[in-house]
Each structure stands twice: as C-alpha cells, then as structure tokens.
C-alpha cells in the first residue's frame, strides 16, 4: 500500500484500539503476509497488547476488527478482515484502495518513491583505490553499492557528495615507481632482478613506454604531469605513474557511468600538517602513552569496542595506517559532513573500532558511530563453470573494465547489487549474457521494453491512456501488480535506512515477475475499449515505476531489446 494509506490505516487501527484499551499506546506495524491468500497486510497489535491487558489475544483481535470495520473511514480502505493463528489480524483492501497507486504514479511520475528535500547532507566515500593499478572487481562492487546508496539518499531528500580517497602515500607507491623503472630499463617480471614487491601487469609496461616517450598525463582533478624520460629519476617516475593510473581509473569510472564530486589525496593530510596536528591533539588530550619506543592510542578506553590499544607511531618513527584515516575523517567532520558513509571491503573490519576510537579521543563531539560503514565481501568471477582469476591487463586479477567489456555496464551494476553486501557473491558471466528469465537484468529490462512496445502498438497517445478509468482494473493479477507498485516508496525508504540497495534489486525482480504474470493472464489489447485503456494505463504505471527503480541502481530502462 501507499505510504499515506499505510499511515492512515495505522491511525485507524490506533483509534480502534483506543476504543477498547484507552490506556494502551501500541506500536502498530503492518506487514505483507508471506502467503498472498492471507490478505494484503497483517498486524500483530492484538498479540502485542494481550499480555499487559490480560486479555485473550484472539478475543482482543476480534474486538479490534469489529471496531475497525464499524469505522466508515476504515471501510474506504479495508474490505474485510480475519483473525489468524494466535491473534494476527489479516486485512484485505478495497478495490479503490488498491487502484489508488495508478493515480499516484500518474501525478508524480519520476518523483514517485522520492521524498521531499531535507536540510541534511551526507558524504559517501567509496572505491578509494590505491593508484597502483587498474580497478578490480572488488572496486566494481564498491562502485555499484556506493553509487546506488548515493542515489537512494538523494531520493530520500539528502544533499549527497560522492568522494574518492586516493591512498597515494605509502610503500605501495614506491613499489609502483620501482616497477615502472625496471620496465623502462628493459627488465621483465620474470627476470631475477625484478623488484621483489613489483607490480607485474602489462599496464606497467604501458606506463614505462609512455614515460620514456616523455608523454603528458592528467587525472580528472589534477594538473598535467609531464614525463622527463629520465629512468634514474625515481621521483619523476613516481609522479608520472600515479598520474597515469589515476587517469586510467578515471576512465574505468567513466565506463561505469560514475562521476565523483571530490577526490581527496592521502598525501595532502601530510603536506597540510593534518596528521601531525591530529596526533598532537590526541597526546594533549591524554589518550596516548609511549611503550617500547612507540606511541600508542588507548583505544580500549574510548568506548568504540576495540579489544586492544593500537600503535600510532612506530618505534622507527613512521605512522601506522589508521592514523591518517583518523585525520581524514576529522577533515570530513570539519567540512560539515556530520553524516558520513564508507563503502569498503570486509578486510577493513578491524579498522572500524580504531578509527572511531581516534575520533572520540579528539573530543570534538563526534558521534561514536561516525562514520557508518558498509563492508562488502569479495566477488568470484565464473565463466564456463570455471573461476576467472587472471587478467592480462592487470596481471593477477580481473578488472572492472574486464567485467564491463564482457557483459556491459547494466549487468555489472545490477549483479553486484543484487546480494547483501556482507555476503560472498559469484558473478556468473554466462548468466549475465543470457537472454532468459534466469538473468534478472534481462528479465527486468525486457518487462520495461515490452511495455514500451505494447503502448506503441496500441496507437493511443499518452493523454488518452492517462485518462483511463483505473476502476476497471479488478483481475487478481492486476490487484497483485498494483500492490507491488504501491510498495515501492517504502522499499526505497527501507533500502536507504539499511544502506542496502539489494532491496531495490529484489523489488525490481518481483515487480517484473508480477507484470509478466499479469501480461500472461490477461489480454491487454482487448476489444473492450475502456478495459483496454485501463490496462494500458496500468502498463504505463508499471513502466514508470520500473524506470524509477532501475534509475536508483544506475541501470538503463531500455525501450527496445
């Protein structure tokens, strides 16, 4: 049911309860029964109140039902009610209540499922790869999840900023530079003098070739970097290689249809003095101590659940990796982002408590749950029943660009979103390429394209279809489809609240299934002109909501296939 219908029904149930138990203050929840034959919605309010009221739950449920059905306002929504099991109340809607979604979608169009704007902003950080190689399938999952979460928050009225954090300071950048230098000197990955921690992908040879050619490269947010071609200048090689790979990652993101609002460089935390100031503040606040020549943070005393204190500055003088993370998240807070979400691999699980502890130690009034985290598990790529592990381009892993070239951007986005982030996922290339009902992307996009074709072949214009009488829509499969469409705004709300875009993917698959079921059960282009127009209006309504849902995942609503 529509959100406004849901709130109205909850208020009607509360009024019915108040007539029986004036002192009660129930938390009334409505759910869709797992079995459609049991009704349109169900509530356990009678079971919730029975014990404190010292009443039999079924008798109390009957009293609530009697009071509800005696209310004229309720009869406009509720057609019938029954008591099930220990005291569940199952409700069935009137035809008019079920048909209301058609008018709602006609009025709201692309805004159906979207909330009013709110004066709140959120920063979502995701992908955040080291500039040491092409983006891999794990980054692709982050890109799909992160962009969908951004779209969900935008639909929920938030001001959303997408941010990419470049880990451009550390040993991995040095390893990149010496790898390119070795290639420039004609040393291959199989040679005994190849660096022990060197990167071996073909892209290293490409960087070396362009460096020797004194090429110029520029990342999306940076200044052009001109190669000198001097193979002895490791710093020049490093700067060129980082810029080269940042540009390559920009191209990967462009192919994915993803544009970031801001790029933040880890190196800037050091050059600006943020890391030093963060450490000095933690020392001044009394949350550190020295032991064995190292500086430790008392994370176990800062209330974020860390199980042991953590080294901040090693005995040889370098900072551990979580220290710049604390400085970075303080920078987020100071930029006015009091809501922040990080999309990262599950291997970052151990950093959550220590980063939050560091932020608590700064005593800036930052909430303990800042930032929020979505930690995803990795992806296994399968083709022909075998795991695909190697990419010629990357040398040791399948890249984001590989996936896009193999199956297309839409399939990559949907497949990487359709499971909970915290579950392992097998990306089946053969399934993603198949034109069958088993392929969810094909199944959903085909539903949208079929509706476009149906409406075009009807010869009716949009105005005629929009004016059709939805009261003619009374077939069981039509009621089922309309109920599914009415759920969409609440699914969007749930997906945003739980940072879980897979709810949208599930809903799209279910909606496509309901549409195909209706299409197969009821002829649309019938001789009865009024019924034909009403069914075309339902089809157009379905097309609009499917398009709205696909847009939240960044997937194309195809008009023909």
Curated annotation (Swiss-Prot):
Gene3D superfamilies the UniProt entry points to: Arginyl tRNA synthetase N-terminal domain, HUPs, Isoleucyl-tRNA Synthetase, Domain 1
Single GO molecular function: ATP binding
InterPro entries for this protein: aa-tRNA-synth_I_CS, Arg-tRNA-ligase, Arg-tRNA-synth_N, Arg-tRNA-synth_N_sf, ArgRS_core, DALR_anticod-bd, Rossmann-like_a/b/a_fold, tRNAsynth_Ia_anticodon-bd
Catalytic activity, EC: 6.1.1.19
Alphabetically ordered keywords of this record: Aminoacyl-tRNA synthetase, ATP-binding, Cytoplasm, Ligase, Nucleotide-binding, Protein biosynthesis
Protein origin, superkingdom: Bacteria
Pfam families assigned to the protein according to its UniProt record, in alphabetical order: Arg_tRNA_synt_N, DALR_1, tRNA-synt_1d
Any one GO CC term of the record: cytoplasm
Motif stretch ('HIGH' region): 129-139
Catalytic activity of the protein: tRNA(Arg) + L-arginine + ATP = L-arginyl-tRNA(Arg) + AMP + diphosphate
NCBIfam families: argS
Protein family per UniProt: Belongs to the class-I aminoacyl-tRNA synthetase family.
Protein name as annotated: Arginine--tRNA ligase
Species this chain originates from: Bordetella avium (strain 197N)
Gene transcribed to yield this protein: argS
């Amino acid at each position: 049911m529509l959100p406004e219908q849901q709130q109205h029904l909850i208020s009607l149930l509360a009024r019915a309860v108040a007539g029986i138990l004036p002192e009660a203050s129930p938390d009334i929840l409505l759910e869709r029964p797992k079995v459609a034959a049991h009704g349109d919605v169900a509530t356990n309010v009678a079971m919730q109140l029975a014990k404190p009221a010292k009443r039999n739950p079924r008798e109390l449920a009957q009293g609530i039902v009697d009071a509800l059905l005696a209310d004229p306002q309720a009869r406009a929504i509720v057609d019938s009610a029954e008591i099930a099991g220990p005291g569940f109340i199952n409700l069935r809607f009137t035809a008019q209540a079920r048909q209301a979604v058609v008018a709602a979608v006609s009025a709201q169009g692309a805004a159906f499922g979207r909330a009013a704007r709110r004066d709140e902003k959120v920063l979502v950080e995701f992908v955040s790869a080291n500039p040491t190689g092409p983006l891999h399938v794990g980054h692709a999952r982050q890109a799909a999840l992160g962009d969908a979460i951004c779209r969900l928050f935008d639909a929920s009225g938030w001001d959303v900023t997408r941010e990419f954090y470049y880990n451009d300071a550390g040993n991995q950048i040095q390893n990149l530079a010496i790898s390119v230098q070795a290639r420039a000197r004609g040393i291959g990955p199989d040679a005994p003098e190849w660096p022990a921690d060197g990167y071996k992908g073909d892209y290293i040879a490409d960087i070396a070739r362009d460096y020797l050619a004194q090429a110029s490269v520029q990342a999306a947010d940076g200044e052009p970097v001109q190669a000198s071609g001097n193979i002895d200048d490791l710093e020049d090689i490093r700067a060129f290689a980082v810029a080269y790979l940042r540009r390559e990652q920009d191209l990967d993101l462009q192919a994915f249809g993803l544009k970031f609002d801001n790029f933040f460089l880890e190196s800037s935390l050091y050059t600006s003095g943020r890391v030093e100031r963060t450490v000095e503040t933690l020392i001044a606040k009394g949350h550190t101590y020295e032991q064995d020549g190292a500086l430790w943070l008392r994370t176990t005393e800062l209330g974020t659940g860390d199980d042991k204190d953590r080294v901040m500055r090693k005995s040889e003088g370098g900072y551990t990796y979580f220290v710049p993370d604390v400085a970075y998240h303080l920078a987020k807070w100071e930029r006015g982002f009091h809501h922040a979400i990080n999309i990262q691999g599950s291997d970052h699980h151990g950093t959550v408590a220590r980063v939050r502890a560091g932020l608590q130690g700064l005593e800036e009034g930052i909430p303990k749950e800042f930032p929020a985290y979505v930690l995803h598990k990795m992806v296994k790529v399968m083709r022909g029943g075998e795991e695909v592990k190697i990419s010629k381009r990357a040398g040791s892993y399948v890249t984001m660009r590989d996936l896009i070239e193999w199956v297309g951007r839409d399939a990559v986005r949907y497949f990487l979103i359709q499971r909970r982030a915290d579950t392992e996922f097998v990306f089946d290339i053969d399934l993603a390429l198949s034109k069958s009902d088993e392929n969810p992307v094909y199944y959903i996009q085909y539903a949208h394209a079929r509706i476009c074709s149906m409406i075009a072949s009807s010869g009716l214009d949009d105005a005629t279809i929009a004016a059709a009488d939805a009261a003619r829509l009374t077939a069981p499969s039509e009621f089922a489809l309309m109920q599914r469409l009415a759920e969409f705004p609440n699914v969007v709300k749930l997906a945003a609240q739980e940072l879980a875009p897979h709810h949208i993917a599930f809903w799209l698959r279910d909606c496509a299934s309901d549409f195909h079921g209706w299409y197969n059960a009821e002829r649309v282009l019938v001789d009865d002109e009024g019924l034909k127009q009403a069914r075309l209006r339902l089809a157009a309504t379905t097309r609009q909501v499917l398009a709205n849902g696909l847009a939240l995942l960044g997937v194309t609503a195809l008009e023909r296939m």
